């Protein structure tokens, strides 16, 4: 693949960064204007992706699908595009001119550019608006944790972005993740800036701000590294051109970056760290002017001029007598105090610019401050290249510094010289790759990692140039420990862990720095092990946004087809889903659950649905599950089974008294309502019938007839017809499956029992509401006698009505009870189809229910017959129970049979009292 055509080759360590604009004015009025316009400029910053397009055009895909195939295998070739030139090298390291587009800005507008860079960290945000201000103010006033409240929308934003992008636009997706974080950082920064200092809730917001800043830059790193790694994987079999013997430094380094992924990706890390520093430059625009004119050390110059006057009576303290750049060192004399302060401040800002990869801005600043000589010292890193060596019709200009090595040795020595300021030494240490002198000014994790990687790239490039470029004999060389260093990524982080700086060690243990470390190393397994440690150590204390990041990082790896440890990935997803459930992000749960293995997805979503109680919300959750391609039928079945099995109580034997129903508890109410999950989809009517039967069996065993009746009512009346219709629609020539057939029969058995029980309750209530015969008081008056006669007539009328209703109820309840006791085709709660799949628990419960319910029903029937004077029919119960056809005697215990015989004896005695024989027949004399 063609990797040529990079234009001017830049330094391996000093990138051609964007050029900002030089301020021409620095006045109190200017500062006030900059300060007043700060908020307005937040929304008007140039979007990062316009300045530093980390996704070159060849990587971008015009197709953005409306829906995402959640389980599609990734097509890596589509992710990167198939253009002619390697997209990776378009955004290569500082040697090739930085990952950014170089934009030369006019000097007069330098300060204006920097004023917008104050908000550089808060990129990709919407313009400032009144609505946003009102929202922020409301959040600040009402919420206990404004940061958490303001960032809550990120959970849904990330999912929407994930679903919007296909696997071929995965890097656009990562870029969008970064933009979402950037927008949120902008909002949180405004909340923090307007907060009252010292309030606890705003300290939480500041912590949230830092967390999201770290996430934002981690997504940036991820996109940069893995775009290059995937491109490398696609080109690993490519043949690279052999470097010519007389190749220039530029050509050699260009070839090195083409073939060596370590150098290339290390430079990407440097670029990434410099982009972070560039974001954090902040109020640099307010401090770029150090002198009123383009004259350096003007206070010293003024003092020296004054001393030449005969009338001078001021201080005679020692000062330099010459103002060339080397004078203070050569003469070992100081500058004026004000100049020394300005010099220290200038050097610190120059290092800040170089740390941010903004070398040209540093040079411009030097020129503005009258130190053109210092700007020249920052120019010597450019790689030498003479395009005229290979001939050509036109003479082209020579690039770079032919004496770059001498320049570099001078920089190294200057960095070693303790007479210079620590930041001046650090500047030239960075230029020469002198790690020892660079580290003292690196106080943070980012600074330290930048120093190591910058020096590593510089060293590897210098080694390549030394072995591949023919050079003139040079009497001096760079130190052996620099040129002979054996650099690896692992070695960098080992050195980092051995630092004596407490802050760096502490930051090294922070979650996002650990993630960044493993991303740089390309060690996905190591990263998964860290995730596992975090979950085992503080699963419930991990920040929600960190869990969201971990989840989407795993989904990113899966999209690229990279292997992650399955157990850890599952645990991360499960933990994130549990967080979404706790925080009530109902609309998001299904789409993350579908990335779990099917059995776990069913169990996890079913567990979530157990907590959903509102009917409309349940329907909504099932619709979301369908959209996410979850197995809705299995999930709803699992929900019902989970809830109905929560009661560990065993079937218990009924007492033989016709006691009232046991009350319905809250747990019972959950079991009743859970049937709703199975009635949304008509295709699940058979399952609804089976689960409803299972719940009602438990209720009947506990004498909770009202609860059982409520479950029965939950099952749509057309369910049996619907089951048969579905069987016909599927073109099944055979009868219903045995399980469905038996479930229908059981459902009818329960209906018959509930009807009999309800009718008995009506009969029992009516039986005990007999009209009371009026009594005549002793020695009544005539009026009282007349009133008594009227009451007797009314009583006789009421009694007649009551008796007629009682007879009707008695006939009805007898019929319904006989329907249960003499249930057709084998008896009540007995399956007809024996070819069904065995369900030992169900079979056991049905046998127990026969033993619990049928004897009690028999006793109730005897009570009805005996109470209504049908003694002869009472004795016929013995024939029914002992019948070999129905074999009801098998469900009676010895105690129950003894009690039944006792009741039959009482009925026989009543017949004897009526002058009949014990069986109710007339006595034949």
UniProtKB/Swiss-Prot annotation:
The modification Phosphothreonine is found at residues 46, 55, 64. One of its GO terms (molecular function) is structural constituent of nuclear pore. Changing residue 101 to I: In GAMOS7; decreased function in nephrogenesis; unable to fully rescue morpholino-induced nephrogenesis defects in Xenopus; decreased protein amount detected by Western blot in patient cells; affects exon 4 splicing resulting in decreased levels of wild-type mature transcript; impairs assembly of nuclear pore complex. It comes from the Eukaryota. Keywords: Acetylation, Centromere, Chromosome, Disease variant, Epilepsy, Intellectual disability, Kinetochore, Membrane, Methylation, mRNA transport, Nuclear pore complex, Nucleus, Phosphoprotein, Protein transport, Translocation, Transport. The modification Phosphoserine is found at residues 4, 10-11, 37, 57-58, 69, 86. Changing residue 889 to C: In NPHS11; decreased function in nephrogenesis; unable to fully rescue morpholino-induced nephrogenesis defects in Xenopus; decreased interaction with NUP133. Its main location: nucleus. Residues 35-49, 55-66 have a biased composition (Polar residues). The modification Asymmetric dimethylarginine is found at residue 60. Pfam families: Nup84_Nup100 (PF04121). The modification Omega-N-methylarginine is found at residues 60, 68. It is linked to Nephrotic syndrome 11: A form of nephrotic syndrome, a renal disease clinically characterized by severe proteinuria, resulting in complications such as hypoalbuminemia, hyperlipidemia and edema. Kidney biopsies show non-specific histologic changes such as focal segmental glomerulosclerosis and diffuse mesangial proliferation. Some affected individuals have an inherited steroid-resistant form and progress to end-stage renal failure. NPHS11 is an autosomal recessive, steroid-resistant and progressive form with onset in the first decade of life. Ovarian dysgenesis 6: A form of ovarian dysgenesis, a disorder characterized by lack of spontaneous pubertal development, primary amenorrhea, uterine hypoplasia, and hypergonadotropic hypogonadism as a result of streak gonads. ODG6 is an autosomal recessive condition. Belongs to the nucleoporin Nup84/Nup107 family. PANTHER family: NUCLEAR PORE COMPLEX PROTEIN NUP107, NUP107-RELATED. Part of the nuclear pore complex (NPC). Forms part of the Nup160 subcomplex in the nuclear pore which is composed of NUP160, NUP133, NUP107 and Nup96; this complex plays a role in RNA export and in tethering Nup98 and NUP153 to the nucleus. Does not interact with TPR. Interacts with ZNF106. Plays a role in the nuclear pore complex (NPC) assembly and/or maintenance. Required for the assembly of peripheral proteins into the NPC. May anchor NUP62 to the NPC. Involved in nephrogenesis. This is Nuclear pore complex protein Nup107. It comes from Homo sapiens.
């Amino acid at each position: 693949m063609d990797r040529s055509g990079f234009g001017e080759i830049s330094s391996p360590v000093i990138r051609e960064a964007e050029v900002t604009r030089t301020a021409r004015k620095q006045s109190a009025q200017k500062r006030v204007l900059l300060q007043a316009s700060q908020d307005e400029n937040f929304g008007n910053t140039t979007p990062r992706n316009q300045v530093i397009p980390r996704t070159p055009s060849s990587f971008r895909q015009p197709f953005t699908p409306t829906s995402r195939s959640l389980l599609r295998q990734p097509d890596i070739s589509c992710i990167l595009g198939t253009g002619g030139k390697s997209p990776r090298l378009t955004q290569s390291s500082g040697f090739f001119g930085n990952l950014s587009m170089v934009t030369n800005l006019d000097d007069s507008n330098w300060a204006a550019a920097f004023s917008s860079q104050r908000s550089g960290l808060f990129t990709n945000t919407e313009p400032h608006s009144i609505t946003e201000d009102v929202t922020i103010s409301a959040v600040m006033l009402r919420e206990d944790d404004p940061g958490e409240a303001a960032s809550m929308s990120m959970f849904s934003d990330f999912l929407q972005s994930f679903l919007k992008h296909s696997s071929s636009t995965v890097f656009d997706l990562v870029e969008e993740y970064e933009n979402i974080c950037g927008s949120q950082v902008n909002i949180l920064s405004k909340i923090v800036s307007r907060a009252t200092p010292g309030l606890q809730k705003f300290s939480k917001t500041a912590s949230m701000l830092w967390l999201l800043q770290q996430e934002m830059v981690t997504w940036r790193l991820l996109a940069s590294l893995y775009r290059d790694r995937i491109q490398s994987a696609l080109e690993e079999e490519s043949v690279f051109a052999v470097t010519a013997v007389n190749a220039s430094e530029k050509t050699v380094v260009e070839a090195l970056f083409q073939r060596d992924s370590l150098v290339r990706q290390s430079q990407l890390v440097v670029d990434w760290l410099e982009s972070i520093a560039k974001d954090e430059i902040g109020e640099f625009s307010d401090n770029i002017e150090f002198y009123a004119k383009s004259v350096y050390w003007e206070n010293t110059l003024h003092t020296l001029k004054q001393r030449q006057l005969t009338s001078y009576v001021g201080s005679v303290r020692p000062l330099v007598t010459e103002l060339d750049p080397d004078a203070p060192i050569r003469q070992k004399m100081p500058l004026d105090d004000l100049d020394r302060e300005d010099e220290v401040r200038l050097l610190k800002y120059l290092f800040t610019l170089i740390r941010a990869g903004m070398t040209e801005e540093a040079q411009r600043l030097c020129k503005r401050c009258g130190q053109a000589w210092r700007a020249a010292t920052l120019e010597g890193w450019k790689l030498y290249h003479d395009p005229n060596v290979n001939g050509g019709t036109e003479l082209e200009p020579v690039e770079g510094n032919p004496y770059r090595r001498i320049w570099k040795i001078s920089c190294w020595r200057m960095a070693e010289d303790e007479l210079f300021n620590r930041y001046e030494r650090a500047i030239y240490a960075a230029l020469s790759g002198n790690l020892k002198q660079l580290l003292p000014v690196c106080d943070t994790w980012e600074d330290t990692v930048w120093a190591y990687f910058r020096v590593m790239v510089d060293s590897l490039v210098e080694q390549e140039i030394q072995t591949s470029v023919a050079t003139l004999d040079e009497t001096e060389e760079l130190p052996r420990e620099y040129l002979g260093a054996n650099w690896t990524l692992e070695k960098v982080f080992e050195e980092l862990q051995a630092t004596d700086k407490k802050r760096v060690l502490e930051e090294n243990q922070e979650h996002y720095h650990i993630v960044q470390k493993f991303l740089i190393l390309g060690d996905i397994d190591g990263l998964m092990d860290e995730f596992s440690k975090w979950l085992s150590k503080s699963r419930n204390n991990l920040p929600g946004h960190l869990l969201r990041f971990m989840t989407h990082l795993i989904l990113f790896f899966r999209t690229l087809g990279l292997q992650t440890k399955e157990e850890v990935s599952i645990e991360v997803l499960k933990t994130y889903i549990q967080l979404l459930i706790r925080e009530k992000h109902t609309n998001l749960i299904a789409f993350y659950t579908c990335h779990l293995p099917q059995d776990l997805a069913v169990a996890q979503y079913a567990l979530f649905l157990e907590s959903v109680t509102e009917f409309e919300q349940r329907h909504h959750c099932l619709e979301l599950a369908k959209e996410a391609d979850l197995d809705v039928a299995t999930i709803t079945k699992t929900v019902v089974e989970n809830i109905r099995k929560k009661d560990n109580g065993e079937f218990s034997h009924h007492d033989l008294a016709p006691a009232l129903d046991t009350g319905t508890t809250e747990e019972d109410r959950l079991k009743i309502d859970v049937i709703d999950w199975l009635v949304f989809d008509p295709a699940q009517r058979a399952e609804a019938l089976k689960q409803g039967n299972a719940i009602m069996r438990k209720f009947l065993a506990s004498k909770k007839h009202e609860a059982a009746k409520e479950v029965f009512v939950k099952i749509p009346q057309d369910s049996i017809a619907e089951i048969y219709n579905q069987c016909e629609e599927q073109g099944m020539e055979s009868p219903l499956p045995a399980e469905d057939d038996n479930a229908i029969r059981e459902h009818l058995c329960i209906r018959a029992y509930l009807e009999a029980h309800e009718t008995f309750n009506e009969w029992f209530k009516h039986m005990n509401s007999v009209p009371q015969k009026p009594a005549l008081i002793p020695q009544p008056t005539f009026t009282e006698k007349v009133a008594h006669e009227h009451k007797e007539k009314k009583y006789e009328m009421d009694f007649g009505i009551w008796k007629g209703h009682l007879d009707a109820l008695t006939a009805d309840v007898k019929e319904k009870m006989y329907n249960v006791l003499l249930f057709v085709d084998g008896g009540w709660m007995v399956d007809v189809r024996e070819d069904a799949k065995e369900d030992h628990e169900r079979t056991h419960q049905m046998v127990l229910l026969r033993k619990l319910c049928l004897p009690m029903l028999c006793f109730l029937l005897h009570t009805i017959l005996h109470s209504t004077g049908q003694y002869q029919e009472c004795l016929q119960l013995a024939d029914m129970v002992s019948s070999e056809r129905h074999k009801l005697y098998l469900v009676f215990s010895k105690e129950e049979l003894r009690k039944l015989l006792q009741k039959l004896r009482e009925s026989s005695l009543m017949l004897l009292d009526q002058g009949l024989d014990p069986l109710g027949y007339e006595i034949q004399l």
